[in-house]
Amino acid sequence: MALTLRDVQQDVAKQTLKPIYLIQGTDQYLLDQVRSAFVSLIPDEDRTLNLAQFDMRETPLGVAVDDARSVPFFGDRRVVMIDDAYFLTGENPRTKVEHHVEDLIAYAEHPEPQTVLVIFAPYEKLDSRKKVVKLLKEQAAYLAFGDLTEKDVRSMITDKLRQNGFEMSGPAIQLLVRLTNMSLTQIMSELD
């Protein structure tokens, strides 16, 4: 099921979470926003036990899936994040890490109810011909960040300013967008 960033933030705020989230897109600011939202689910004192992050360029997929299958320790839920899920693309990098996507397919069919598995694919496109991609797009909550338009960026700037109790004129926002080459990461760091 396709979602927006606001949908994901509402899921987290209301604690009405799906068992699996697939996050796709190249905008680092938006990826960081999603990551922060999921990290905030686990209290600081429980993060060592109930928050795990795995980089797929260094760790086999099976290790992350096994961790997702384990129940939370002294907490209500566990969050497992899979970073750089290049096996969902057509990319075939030179790496010694071997991934068995069958493990993820089996997990997606029967996820652990107390675990939230978040898969980050920081790519423009996924290989929709792959069985695992088709299954995740059907079973997981799917958030894809497409190319942001100037209108999207301006709207996000206005929202951010409003949240902080500020306003900015249209021409000033347009100038900020132009001077930062529409880089949302740079814009948001300037606004902070």
What are these regions (language model features)?
Residues 1-192:
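Conserved beta/loop motifs at nucleotide-recognition and modification sites
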